[in-house]
Design a protein with these regions (language model features):
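Charged linear interaction tracts used for macromolecular binding and regulation
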Residues: 73-231
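Long, polar/Ser/Thr-enriched low-complexity segments
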Residues: 1-117
Length: 231
């Protein structure tokens, strides 16, 4: 509220409509209030929500993202988190910032040209996720039987993920320990390969989506062909 001591024609101190008055060096001064920036448009709000969601997912999946994008990050003077956002922002869909959707099969936790492996359908029993892996490429200068196979189990409902190296390209029946809390929840399972030889150290394959798995059940789905971690 503005106050004046000398009538309507005098100066005033305080706010009057969109004008504020004050006394400066003995003079009565008025100036317009600074107006706030225009509210963000609907498109800006939506984009900000999409960035926020993929950023949060990247934090949950960081153990996988760190390994899967490490080689590309070094090659491009970038960060693993930045590359995860770049490769996955398009996986966030929807027109309502409060009801965004996620293309879980389309998520990429790694990126590269390394040849992949053949993966069976994942199954969770208790706290053990099991998946069978077999070599999909003859060893050559780009691949080696010692290449590491990573599996990631992601539970969006709990905002939790477990990722680890479960074995090598040589193949076998591999397991990954997951929290007991995953029971009854939808768990998305991914796999990728990281090179371990002198000619491909650190290089990655692209990510394969192996499907969803719950206790005693599974629903397999893969990218680029049945059971293949692609390069």
């Amino acid at each position: 509220m503005a106050k004046t001591n000398w009538g309507i024609t005098s100066g005033f101190i305080g706010k009057l409509g969109n004008v504020v008055g004050f006394n400066w060096k003995g003079k009565n001064v008025q100036r317009a209030l600074v107006q706030g920036a225009d509210p963000r448009s609907g498109a800006q709000i939506l984009q900000r929500a999409r960035f926020g969601m993929i950023g949060q997912m990247g934090s949950v999946l960081y153990d996988a993202v760190y390994e899967g994008f490490r080689h590309e990050a070094r090659s491009n003077s970038s960060t693993q988190s930045g590359l995860f956002l770049k490769h996955n922002l398009s996986a966030i869909g929807g027109t309502d910032p409060e009801a965004l959707t996620v293309d879980y099969p389309g998520l990429q936790l790694s990126y590269g040209k390394l040849k992949g492996v053949e993966c069976g359908t994942p199954v969770i029993n208790g706290t053990t996720l099991s998946v069978t892996v077999s070599n999909a490429a003859a060893p050559n200068r780009r691949t080696a039987l010692t290449d590491r196979v990573y599996v990631c189990a992601y539970c969006p409902a709990l905002e939790d993920a477990v990722c680890g190296c479960v074995g090598t390209r040589a193949g076998g029946d591999f397991t990954l320990t997951v929290p007991a809390g995953y029971a009854g929840e939808t768990v998305h399972v991914y796999a990728f390969v990281i090179g371990a030889s002198s000619t491909n150290e650190g290089q990655a394959s692209t990510t394969a989506y192996l499907g969803t798995a719950g206790n005693g059940s599974s629903s397999g789905r893969n990218t680029g062909g049945p059971g293949t971690v692609n390069g």
